[in-house]
Amino acid sequence: MASLIYRQLLSNSYVTNISDEVSEIGARKTANVTVNPGPFAQTGYAPVNWGHGELSDSTLVQPTLDGPYQPTTFNLPIDYWMLIAPTQIGRVAEGTNTTNRWFACVLVELNVQNTQREYVLDGQTVQLQVSNDSSTLWKFILFIKLEKNGTYTQYSTLSTSNKLCAWMKREGRVYSYAGVTPNASESYYLTINNDDSNVSSDAEFYLIPQSQTELCTQYINNGLPPIQNTRNVVPVSLTSREIRHSRAQMNEDIVVSKTSLWKEMQYNRDITIRFKFANSIVKSGGLGYKWSEISFKPMNYQYTYTRDGEEITAHTTCSVNGVNDFTYNGGPLPTDFAISRFEVIKENSYVYIDYWDDSQAFRNMVYVRSLAADLNDVVCSGGDYSFALPVGAYPIMSGGAVTLSPAGVTLSTQFTDYVSLNSLRFRFRLAVSEPSFSISRTRLSGIYGLPAANPNNSVEYYEIAGRFSLISLVPTNDDYQTPIANSVTVRQDLERQLGELREEFNSLSQEIALSQLIDLATLPLDMFSMFSGIKSTVEAVKSMTTNIMKKFKTSNLANAISDLTNSMSDAASSISRSASVRSIGSNTTMRISTAIQTGEDLRTMTDASTQISNVSRSLRLREFTTQTDNLSFDDISAAVLKTKLDKSTQISQTTIPDIISESSEKFIPMRTYRVMDNDTGFETGIDGTFYAYRIDTFDEIPFDVEKFNRLITDSPVLSAIIDFKTLKNLNDNYGITKTQAMELLQSNPRTLKEFINSNNPIIRNRIENLIAQCRL
């Protein structure tokens, strides 16, 4: 079928007038510029592997166990436990306020009798009396002195099996742990001038907030969590704990991440939302005393306001959801006042406001995440509406009010008369407010909510102030705008029709008679005979055929054919006939990316299978240069398409161009191709299978890749309608003559029809399998 379309393209049978070009341009702008639906309304997924990046948050998430940090000297923050985890005996840490307090902590190993040891404390070498009588517990000893040149005295001890100690500055005191684990508890020593007290640690340490003192006590008595004792936990410098404070601007653009083609931009904007309700009041026929409907309608509103000195043009669409229907009937007479239905929004209702403005934030609002908004509440109060009766005093509906509170924000698309806009949809929940509404001269009163009769109360608009923030994936080039879903409804209707037509086409495969299919495949089909089953005029068929040609010219198959044609043209311009024949083959082989290599290059059967598969996918184009009088896969595809077009009940002029171009690429995807050399046949399949066999006996022989490479360059490439497996199965079970074998190898339609008419199950099954592959 593709070759049929290809040959008619080459023959220039069809032309395009200016009206066709205008229609095509309009179709591109209105129907074909679409984005695949994504998780938000009419947006789509990004065309890259898009991670969430770093998320900014105003909440300080404080870890319970912060560390470990490398040994250092620093001013320990107030209200933080410094949990020290030494790995060797000796000095653990020391500190001072530089005036009247010097303190130091040392670690003593097991089984140490009362002895003097030498330590370097406060830059001086001192002798301290230490001991540890326990054979199972390590011992921390806290020493303190009150003068620069004074003597250290023992203050408290902590015996532990976990080699952990801790202290904290709080309320003018130094707190530490004392006792014996697992019953150690905190104690304190009075000190002054905590703000200038520096601490020097000789071991790794952790910081724990005072609010987690209970957990710190648990660590002292029972040890650190298992994760902290692995070799993968690496201490870091204390400087990594520094927090840099920054204040976000109300209106700013921040580059979150950036690659060569795309970047993530965070847009922070303060906005002013102005909106108004629209309503529809319909009066019934008759004497003029009855109304059939009072309802809310969507309302578009365009306005300008100033943001940071810049004039912003904004567009909003206000709509309601979850309305409540009320009725009023004053009596059965034609002159009795009555309202068949009037709408009221109450607590169970929602108001949606779609907002768009001309700022950079909305220019590429297609791929969006981290969307948040903060808006004010607004009170909407109803006004008076007089029902003009032919005679008598007018009933007046008055009052009613609701408060709109923000309930969320999502993405949406606004459709105006000229363009569709990717916008933000702000959702508001409602709460009823005073006053209630009533209708004068009736018993209807004391009802809460906002009726649709006069929801704007003569004000020009309602206004909400607030701000929003979002992160959008946009092109790195600021001059490029990401396409949005223009006229998406038109395209969706067409896609729905195409989907239904595809289902019908696929279901019709079982209704095709095999014998008639072979006859139809041998006919010289053209485009006009293809559409003979469609009720239409000749001019309509011409127009439809032109559209099919346009669709086909933009397909992947047509592009590959164009490359092949260029190669043939280059070869035809060669000087000698023999050179041109070789040029056709070599250029074609190059264009179709023939990756066949010889001998030593084919190390494994897997390599050969991959290369053969790549060649088989491209031999379809090579087949165009060697058209024969026998059947090809495209002949069967065209016959199946013709049969299904005749049987279809849903085909139309708008859908047939898509169906034909799609069929030319998708019908019979699992094809097998054959080249022959005297008594040897070579077959390759799309699935990577390949066979070489004797034609007279169908005995398989080794596949000569070098010979195959030469044959596909110089010899005709045939469609293997009846492939090697089917032929061998047929010969083994039924026995066939050499003449029949040659005709089946060449896909002779007469021989195929004879086997089908004789109900040969093997041949019928093969043809039915090909028909089943003609799917969309």
Curated annotation (Swiss-Prot):
Quick one: a GO biological-process term for this protein?
A: permeabilization of host organelle membrane involved in viral entry into host cell
Sequence motif: DGE motif, positions: 308-310
* Region feature (Spike body and stalk (antigen domain)): 248-479
Q: Which InterPro entries match?
A: ConA-like_dom_sf, Rota_A_VP4, Rota_VP4_MID, Rota_VP4_MID_sf, VP4_concanavalin-like, VP4_helical
Q: Which domain of life is it from?
A: Viruses
The cross-references to SUPFAM superfamilies, in alphabetical order and at most eight, read:
Concanavalin A-like lectins/glucanases (SSF49899), VP4 membrane interaction domain (SSF111379)
Enumerate the residue ranges of region (Spike head).
Answer: 65-224
Q: Where is this region: Hydrophobic?
A: 389-409
Coiled-coil annotation reads: 484-511
- Its name, as the record gives it, is Outer capsid protein VP4
